[in-house]
Amino acid sequence: MLENNNGEMFCPNDEWRVKIKRRTHMLNQKYNSLTEYQPEARGEIIREILGEMGENVYFQGPVTFHYGKHTKVGNNTFFNFNFTCQDDTEVTIGDNCDFGPNVTIATPLHPMLADERKELMCPDGVARRLCYAKPVHVGNRCWICANVTILPGVTIGDGCVIGAGSVVTRSIPANSF
């Protein structure tokens, strides 16, 4: 279930959302405490974190997922050190991708206008700042180099190379460098 996928404002501190995130954060810590010499245990934990995961997927670690369950990873994909995924809504990653160290995928957004960033009343009667989220999609056979940040609403087409240090603010057509 993609609770935050409609682009509408939501309260990230709703009790049920916090419960999911705390569970995922605990699993992140568990995964990160294991060494690469414990592949079976790491595999079990990462499968608990992710919504879907294909075959032959490897996360070097450490990893940080926000929800985890909103992320789907295809087959034969490698993630180097320090992969961060703020998956407040859907993140899909295709087959045969490589991610360099320190890659961040972010789906949440806060309003751009100052008046819209003020605290609003949540369903539980507590005033909080709201946010919204836009999905991120990475196609097949992509290479996302070191220190790349992919921002909300971006689609990276099949066969792309995103150069080291890039901040991806807009969608990228297939087979682009």
Task: Go through each PLM region and give its residues.
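Terminal amphipathic alpha-helical/low-complexity segments used for targeting or macromolecular assembly
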Residues: M1-N56, M112
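Short secondary-structure boundary/capping segments
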Residues: L2, I49, R128, K134-P135, ...
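Residues at alpha-helix boundaries and short interhelical turns
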Residues: T35-E36, Y67, D87, I172
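Short conserved AdoMet
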Residues: G54, D98, P173
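Gly/Ser/Thr-rich helix-start
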Residues: E8, P101, A146, A164-S166
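Flexible, glycine/small-residue-enriched loop-and-beta-strand segment within the central core
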Residues: V63-V73, F78-T155
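C-terminal/domain-terminus segments
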Residues: T149-F177
